[in-house]
A protein has these predicted regions:
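Short alpha-helix carrying the canonical HExxH Zn2+-binding catalytic motif
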Residues: 1, 5
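Acidic/His/Gly-enriched intrinsically disordered linker/tail segments
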Residues: 7-132
Length: 132
């Protein structure tokens, strides 16, 4: 994944490059041959952070404010944010918006025009907590 990112989107933010790379740690192919990420061992780390109210916002993640704080949590957060977008068929469009030079917040606003950043973050957290 890293080699493909370096070719297709060399300016990709670290959180996206690592989120996509870790997304495919556990994956399957759908009937059309497309790779789809699935839940994996990183899920409990993320769920625990949400329950303890220790998870930074998606805005903080995309702004690069969180990587040094807790690497395990950072990787889980980036991975499951990509999985969240994948489940909603927005991962490809989100990637393309970023590649066009939009920030993560701008890309989310284009894909979720009727939702605030806080609403998207809340939807993400609720979705993560229901995963098994």
């Amino acid at each position: 994944t890293h080699a493909l990112m370096a070719f297709d989107f060399p300016a990709a933010p670290d959180w996206l490059a690592e989120g996509l790379a870790s997304l495919y740690e556990d994956c399957r192919r759908d009937s059309g041959g497309r790779l789809l990420g699935e839940t994996n061992w990183r899920l409990p780390v993320l769920q625990q952070a949400i329950r303890r109210r220790h998870l930074p916002s998606l805005g903080q993640l995309m702004d690069g404010e969180t990587r040094a704080a807790d690497a395990r949590l950072w990787y889980a957060h980036t991975r499951y944010f990509c999985l969240f977008l994948q489940y909603r068929n927005r991962l490809g469009p989100f990637y393309r918006e970023l590649r066009r030079g939009r920030s993560g917040s701008e890309a989310l606003a284009r894909l979720y025009p009727d939702a605030s950043p806080a609403q998207i973050d809340g939807e993400f957290r609720a979705w993560v907590l229901q995963l098994r």
